[in-house]
């Protein structure tokens, strides 16, 4: 069975804080599939046709396979994936449990610590943050972030008590669980994984106006530097790729994803998070890594879709 004989639903939009990013990802993925000769049905989840009942929106749509271009919320935490499983519609990316696991940063960090996969020390608070515990166990600067949000939305770097209080309040707007993480002083890298193959790491260097590679540095700023090659030696590049694969596989992720990694002042690498539904916008990192490997955007989208389709056929 050829995927080109089927109808592909590109599911995008959603209602998370990353909706605007997803809208661009979905539009670009849709056009890429059309350019490659596929039959496409674009579905803006929670858009005009699905605000009241997105499950019905999906069940009423006529398609055979889904390319998930949702970011954050139910589009990345396993809920949409579970609905598609119940509808018996194959799709790109990780299964429901892996998606939900990876979306919860606190849960993955606790798991990685048990496995011996290096990740920055942290505290997680579900209710009111314990400021005394934070001061007792950690020292400034700190990173404050929602535990289950993407695109670095709600993230802050804090140096003082006043900044900490405000950052905790800001992060609470996006999630009930808040992560307080030690700041790793050093360069940041991201590794794209497609079909269990790690691509060349990209070095991320925000401008001097941005302390972090945050939402603005990702999607708005024009002066963020993306380093390819990333500036590491060949041996260290291989080390970063191996660590990314170890973190990705530990969560039982599949299809494609992206792993964010920091290098500390001691030269050691630590894993920040795994993204199971990365951005596919004009500023996004997965297309950048693929392009460096000689894969253009349209071919990248086709590769992700075909890999997922063939994996589905192997299980039939």
Question: Model segments located where?
Answer:
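Short, flexible, mixed-charge acidic loops at enzyme active sites
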Residues: 80-85, 212-220, 276
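Alpha-helix C-terminal capping segments
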Residues: 82-90, 115, 194, 292-293
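Active-site nucleotide/adenylate-binding loops and adjacent lid/helix of ATP-dependent enzymes
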Residues: 1-11, 58, 101-187
């Amino acid at each position: 069975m050829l995927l080109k004989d089927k109808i592909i639903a590109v599911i995008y939009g959603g209602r998370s804080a990353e909706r605007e990013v997803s809208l661009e990802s979905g539009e670009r993925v849709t056009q890429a599939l059309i350019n490659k000769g596929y039959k496409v049905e674009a579905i803006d989840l929670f858009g005009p046709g699905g605000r009241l009942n997105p499950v019905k929106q999906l069940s009423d749509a006529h398609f055979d396979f889904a390319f998930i271009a949702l970011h954050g919320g139910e589009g990345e935490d396993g809920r949409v994936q579970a609905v598609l499983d119940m509808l018996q519609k194959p799709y790109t990316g990780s299964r429901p449990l892996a998606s939900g696991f990876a979306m919860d940063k606190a849960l993955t960090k606790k798991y990685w610590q048990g496995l011996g996969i290096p990740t920055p020390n942290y505290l997680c608070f579900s209710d009111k943050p314990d400021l005394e515990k934070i001061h007792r166990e950690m020292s400034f600067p700190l990173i404050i972030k929602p535990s289950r949000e993407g695109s670095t939305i709600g993230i802050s770097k804090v140096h003082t008590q006043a900044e900490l209080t405000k950052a905790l309040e800001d992060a609470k707007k996006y999630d009930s669980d808040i992560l307080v993480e030690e700041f790793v002083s050093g360069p940041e890298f991201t590794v794209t994984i497609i079909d269990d193959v790690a691509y060349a790491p990209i070095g991320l260097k925000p401008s001097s106006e941005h302390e972090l590679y945050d939402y603005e540095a990702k999607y708005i700023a024009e002066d963020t530097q993306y380093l390819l090659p990333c500036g590491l030696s060949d041996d260290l590049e291989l080390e970063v790729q191996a660590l990314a694969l170890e973190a990705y596989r530990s969560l039982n992720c599949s299809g494609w994803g992206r792993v964010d990694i920091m290098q500390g002042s001691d030269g050691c690498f630590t894993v920040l998070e795994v993204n199971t539904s990365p951005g596919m916008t004009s500023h996004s990192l997965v297309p950048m890594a693929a392009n460096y490997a000689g894969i253009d955007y349209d071919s990248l989208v086709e590769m992700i879709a075909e890999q997922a389709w063939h994996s589905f056929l192997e299980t039939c």
